[in-house]
Amino acid sequence: AVSDLPALRRGYLTFGCNQNLQKITDELLGLWADIMRAVPHSRLRIQAPQLVSEESVSSLRMRLSTLGIALDRVEFALPAARGEYLAGLSEVDFLLDTFPFPGGTTTCEALWMGVPTLTLSGVTLLARQGDSILTVAGLSDWVARDGKEYVAKAVEFSRSPERLQMLRRKLREQVRQSPLFDAERFATGFAQTLWALWRRSLAAKAPQ
């Protein structure tokens, strides 16, 4: 079930990231540090398969500390079975996406649980995956175009817990009605796009 926004009962924002640790670059950590400095008392919850390794945890702790994120504001969550993993999304107010390799399945699962993801769009097909998912889900305002906007949007959303709560309560139904979760509608639209591209290709090759 979709939970209420945790910030309403805690009094502070909890950002989350459920991506593979290899996706978490120093540049990204620098932006997270900027966000947490701008949002007092906020916390960061990181869940990743690699956190079962003490070596991985130690390495990540060192990087976080070096880049300006206080370790007492960070929670490390171990990988979990699917049901427990989805339930764990009730612990975060919204997710901070990685870049240039954003989430895919993790973003969709979070949307289903009422949790939006803030993503940073890039120039390659893969780097625009988060942008594509969120735009189709009706959340284009959760797409940043550069690091500065990524930080600014995170701070802006953090200052409006009531808005986040309203979004959380309606998000599952919103995405359920979008092409993202409507397989037949998605397939129809995809097929129409392919046919349109085919006709365009034929027209370009036709004798003038």
Which residues fall in each region the model found?
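Active-site donor-binding acidic/aromatic loop of nucleotide-activated sugar
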Residues: 71-81, 99
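Nucleotide-sugar donor-binding and catalytic loop/hinge architecture
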Residues: 1-15, 23, 27, 37
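Catalytic binding pocket for nucleotide-activated donors in carbohydrate/polymer assembly enzymes
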Residues: 94, 98-183
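Residues that mark the start of a beta-strand
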Residues: 12-14, 43, 116
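Short acidic alpha-helix that forms the nucleotide-activated donor recognition element
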Residues: 81-92, 112
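C-terminal amphipathic helix plus adjacent low-complexity
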Residues: 9-11, 19-21, 34-37, 41, ...
